[in-house]
């Protein structure tokens, strides 16, 4: 193989870890955090729809087999059973893929769980473009679907460090929670910034004098990587991490965007989700309601069904890789 030839990607790259080569990772942070939490609290039960291994719930099943319920490929039944358990005083942690929760089980989450404001925690793997298996498995519109559901809190953690903190934080939050789950070997990013998850809060991770990126989920990792590369090019970009999409931390968003507007800085939202109905639109609506009008741009997935293929290729193609972000932001800043 010559220096100019790229390594040929195989089908395993369709489900590859989002971690960059050599990046520190932590295996199954959700599963390990839930096992530890269940050791302290007898009310916690785990339910899944034939996906325990692929949502890291198998660790809970091994540790507490009498508190684990395998519901089979029946997501609607899964949510109904969780609702019933919550009504009896249990705290169910439910796992499946994000596409199945948002598309197939929506009505059951809405009527059985959210309307009753039950204490059910729904953790869903393969959010956004974290699989190359095509539209049947890519939950690129899950936030848009769930944002309009009353009582439902939506969380999009960045990395293993944050997931480990979100799990114990949400168990005491009264009401249903939908968490976008990164599983397997999950990158460690925010520990380098002494970050601590604060439920309901967005936090500035890095300051910048030319632009600020407001991001969630894995895009905060990408935003920080892009900021480091842009700094080498003389462009100073700040990063604000907003893990809770709903209810949005409007106070922090307005403060950061307001300061950017006064200073003439660009505000950029970055999300692993369709450009329609996600974090970017939520922030844009907040700014409009309050009369804050900075220069504003979005980095997001297009409003279309996406292709199948190797994840690194797809992330480049759809503009959410670090290199694609760097090129786009540099163009915006210099134009």
Where are these regions (language model features)?
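Thiamine diphosphate
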Residues: 1-180, 185-186, 196, ...
